[in-house]
Amino acid sequence: MATIRELRDRIRSVNSTKKITKAQELIATSRITKAQGRVAAAAPYAEEIQRVLERLASASSLDHPMLREREGGKRAAVLVVTSDRGMAGGYNHNVLKKAAELEKLLAESGYEVVRYVTGKKGVDYYKFRAEDVAGAWTGFSQDPDWAATHNVRRHLIDGFTASSEGEAAWREGLNLSEGQDIQGFDQVHVVYTEFISMLTQNPVVHQLLPVEPVIEDEIFEKGEDLLSSSGDVEPDYEFEPDADTLLEALLPQYVSRRLFSIFLEAAAAESASRRNAMKSATDNASELVKDLSRVANQARQAQITQEITEIVGGAGALADSGESD
């Protein structure tokens, strides 16, 4: 059984750890509020560009490379969004597990998977397992901004535009030297953690490209030569220049903004997951301190009882010795 000194040392150690986890919990809570505010601030632009694209789609041929599912596609890009820091519970484990399931499904469908990663934890995970990563970007998982995410957003769009038959431009973060051939791809999937509430965050897969066009909740289906509407939708606007030209200009912006929104949502989910993990750790530390204090008190009581017994026994022995004299 541990001595009283050892128990008290453990109590001090646990209390010290508890202070750290409590501080991390409070920091994560404040970051959630900031992240939610950024997601909310980005929503009006996203809704407006979505509305404009719906109107453009209703007036255009929808014959755009970003809207077409490529028959005989060979390569699929998978972007795995992880965190730069740990102490976030199952945040990274869950998204990496989801990514592995997606990669297996794509491989079974005949695609060559090209993996990209954001977040130091994901980079370290694949490096430890000696698994290939075509590109990695770190340093912005908790507080993504437009400039920091530029290279990953542009590369995924450029790579899809080039297709598996073409080549994309080199960008910082790719695990290739400048000047080497960078083959494109035919699909782009993003695996990230969706923020649902302070207590719930789920890993999800989002197909970023090709974009599935939706006009007022009517999904467009591919015809013989191009995509055609499943319902009759009349355009409400006259476009200058024509709708196809505007769609050509706006679709890359829409995809880029959609990916940035994913980074913002993942940041909120990361902070929420870290807050939950730190709260659980703080609560567990409190319970452990209670248990250790109880054991220490019991040990102290036993020690005092033993000392009293020894004193009483010694006094009795001295009394008996005096009477015999």
UniProtKB/Swiss-Prot annotation:
It is a peripheral membrane protein. Keywords: ATP synthesis, Cell membrane, CF(1), Hydrogen ion transport, Ion transport, Membrane, Transport. Produces ATP from ADP in the presence of a proton gradient across the membrane. The gamma chain is believed to be important in regulating ATPase activity and the flow of protons through the CF(0) complex. The keyword Chloroplast does not apply. It is found in: Cell membrane. GO terms for molecular function: ATP binding; proton-transporting ATP synthase activity, rotational mechanism. One of its GO terms (cellular component) is proton-transporting ATP synthase complex. PANTHER family: ATP SYNTHASE GAMMA CHAIN (PTHR11693), ATP SYNTHASE SUBUNIT GAMMA, MITOCHONDRIAL (PTHR11693:SF22). NCBIfam families: ATPsyn_F1gamma, PRK05621.1-2. GO terms for biological process: proton motive force-driven plasma membrane ATP synthesis. InterPro entries: ATP_synth_F1_ATPase_gsu, ATP_synth_F1_gsu, ATP_synth_F1_gsu_CS. It comes from the Bacteria. F-type ATPases have 2 components, CF(1) - the catalytic core - and CF(0) - the membrane proton channel. CF(1) has five subunits: alpha(3), beta(3), gamma(1), delta(1), epsilon(1). CF(0) has three main subunits: a, b and c. This is ATP synthase gamma chain. Belongs to the ATPase gamma chain family.
